[in-house]
Amino acid sequence: VPNDNPVTSPAPLRHLLAEVAMARLAEAQALNEEALRQALSQGRPAKCKARILAVVSSKGGVGKTTLCAALASTLHLKGGQTLAIDLDPQNAMQYHLGVQPDVAGMGSASLTGESWSDLLLPGSAESLLLPYGALTEEERHTLERYMANDRHWLARQLARMTLDENDVVILDTPPGRTLYLEQALDVADQIVVVTNTDAASFLTLDQMDSLLATPNMRAPSSEYSYVVNQFDASREFSRDMHEVLKRRLGGKLLGVVSMDHALGEALAYGHNPLLGAGSSPACQDLLNLSEQLKSRLEF
């Protein structure tokens, strides 16, 4: 007589499989712990050949990830590839670069010892993306403990990727001072601080300047600059704040990107506005910014 009841795995088998998976993860973490101990005894690794750009901000909501994705789409050196690495647990860069959401990413690879190069995903405009990936709270704490215990953790990860001198790596970091930011500052050749023409952003400038001036916080040869994002020229207060920022930042002000709601709408529709025939003022600002950074990276 046919059995119409669905076949289910016995509970003990599910438990055994879960135990095997947990044991595998524990073994990988133990290997990582041993690798960390060995790495710490070796000091700082050799500098990665690729040009590294860190995009940072003191506060959220300034359009940092959107700007980071725009640079990943437009900033290319001849003969090289451009990689965006999402160091932000929000894991939002994948949506900006038109990449299908993936569970695997930088986080899980770092815990299991996988090569970051094997997890790169193709994004828009021939860019490549290493997403942050999906982690449990416990896994994220473990990852951040690795970073806290090894000042040059990110430098070691990048060194394993065997990148070329014409490659560009763009790092998207969480807002504020975090372990991810400190790791990014340790390896970056160029640091772009994204700010807005609002009072809250202005009040964080001293905090960021102080951090960037902290001894040994960033690579000795690195340079940093500011970009004013989402500038609304139709508002008098925004125009006044723009003038205040120009005076405050002086030569550290690299560029200004106009407010353009179409950039956010493009994310909703899954296309890259920088690749279209018609170019808005904001798109042109982003292209100009990309060219300026390209000239700085071509050393």
PLM regions: where:
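Conserved nucleotide-binding/hydrolysis micro-motifs of P-loop NTPases
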Residues: 89-90, 125, 134-137, 198-199, ...
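Walker A/P-loop phosphate-binding motif and the immediately C-terminal alpha-helix
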Residues: 48-90
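Cytosolic-facing regulatory segments adjacent to core modules
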Residues: 116, 129-178
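Short, hinge-like loop/turn segments at secondary-structure boundaries
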Residues: 99-104, 211-212, 242-244, 271-274
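Conserved catalytic-core segment of NTP-binding enzymes
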Residues: 78, 164, 168-258
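Phosphate-binding loop that captures ATP/GTP phosphates
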Residues: 78-82, 87-132, 254
